[in-house]
């Protein structure tokens, strides 16, 4: 089996359907003895340019190892699903399991925010004890 990177963008009005779509696509891959090495739901993001008069879309990234038949089926599903406004399936040489730069940056921002919240909470407690 070969390794693939799959990115698809969903219409922003259909964002609530994304978990179900991910579940269906994951079931199709694992049902054919494939493996999902990385699955990232990037959420609703700004598009670089308008597509069908839309300026935002819900992004999903998957790195999978699957047989060609499943990939062909996914490609057909993307093509005929009106909620999917763009998709890209790319063959890769190796399985990619590490977090994408997008997720790494998001985690770093979350850690900084948590550290700042902890520091301000500690400062507030120190101020209360001085009184």
From Swiss-Prot:
Compositional bias ranges of the Acidic residues kind: 120-131
Entry keywords, A to Z: Ribonucleoprotein, Ribosomal protein, RNA-binding, rRNA-binding
S-S bridge residues: none
Gene3D superfamilies: 3.30.70.60
Basic and acidic residues composition-biased segments: 104-116
Entry's Gene Ontology molecular function annotations: small ribosomal subunit rRNA binding; structural constituent of ribosome
Superkingdom in the source lineage: Bacteria
PROSITE patterns (alphabetical): RIBOSOMAL_S6 (PS01048)
rRNA-binding listed as a keyword: yes
Region of interest (Disordered), ranges: 96-131
GO terms under biological process: translation
Gene Ontology CC annotations of this record: cytosolic small ribosomal subunit
PANTHER family, A to Z: MITOCHONDRIAL 28S RIBOSOMAL PROTEIN S6, SMALL RIBOSOMAL SUBUNIT PROTEIN BS6M
HAMAP family to which the protein is assigned, alphabetical: Ribosomal_bS6
UniProt similarity note: Belongs to the bacterial ribosomal protein bS6 family.
Protein function: Binds together with bS18 to 16S ribosomal RNA.
Full protein name: Small ribosomal subunit protein bS6
Species: Salmonella arizonae (strain ATCC BAA-731 / CDC346-86 / RSK2980)
